A protein has these predicted regions:
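Beta-propeller domains
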Residues: 1-223
Length: 223
């Protein structure tokens, strides 16, 4: 199936002295996996009733191992052995979607994310900051003219960077049961610089500096 709608199994291996000592992989629990196994659904909140489990990335933060995905799914907490524990919306503080590729600020230890949920949010994305305690401490909705496939973000000392790129949701494809994104050059391409600090107040979407750039798509920027 398409990558965003597929089942994936995270894996890990232990290396010592140039040799692999063990290897394991597991399916991440989800409503879909539970139904196929004729088991009860996994525990935890499912804000958009998605049947999919996180299928894109695994990372550790705030003492927890998380399986993550973009486009709306709730993160799933895993054990060290990659067994599914439950969905975990950062202990009840995440209002909706998350991402597969958050960024840790090395100076504060906080986790930053640009997130989208194409089926639920068609006119905005959301900036999320997770504190070092593993709880969301700040969110900001960022209006967009359409729903771009927001796969990643960048984080600098002064800015959180949002990529508003010409790969956008096509509802005809979605209703036909196909991969819901397509190349859309008429949409344009721009990069938004959201100030992380504004004197005397929190930054808003109106503070974003938008810069038009040539047509293209960046899955994973690097700075």
């Amino acid at each position: 199936g398409p990558p965003l709608l597929d089942l994936r199994a995270p894996f890990e291996r232990a290396l010592r002295g140039g040799r692999a000592e063990w290897y394991r992989n597991r399916y991440v629990g989800s409503s879909h996996i539970s139904a196929m196994r004729t088991q009860p659904d996994i525990a935890g909140p499912n804000w958009n009733n998605s049947g999919l489990g996180p299928n894109t990335n695994v990372g550790g933060f705030a003492g927890t191992t998380w399986a993550m995905m973009e486009a709306g799914g709730c993160p799933v907490e895993l054990t060290y052995e990659l067994e599914t524990i439950a969905r975990n919306d950062f202990h009840g503080t995440l209002p909706g979607a998350f991402t597969a590729h958050p960024k840790v600020d090395p100076s504060t230890g906080e986790l930053h994310a640009m997130v989208y949920a194409w089926a639920e949010w068609m006119d905005h994305v959301q900036y999320v900051i997770v504190g070092t305690d593993g709880r969301v401490r700040h969110t900001l909705d960022i209006p967009l003219p359409g729903m771009t496939m927001l796969h990643d973000m960048s984080l600098t000392e002064r800015y959180a960077v949002v990529y508003d790129q010409p790969c956008t949701v096509d509802l005809e494809l979605a209703f036909a049961g196909r991969f819901p994104f397509r190349w859309n050059p008429e949409y344009g391409n721009r990069v938004g610089l959201l100030p992380r600090e504004v004197t005397g107040r929190a930054a808003t979407a109106a503070d974003i500096i938008w810069i038009d750039v040539p047509l293209g798509y960046s899955f994973h920027p690097m700075n």
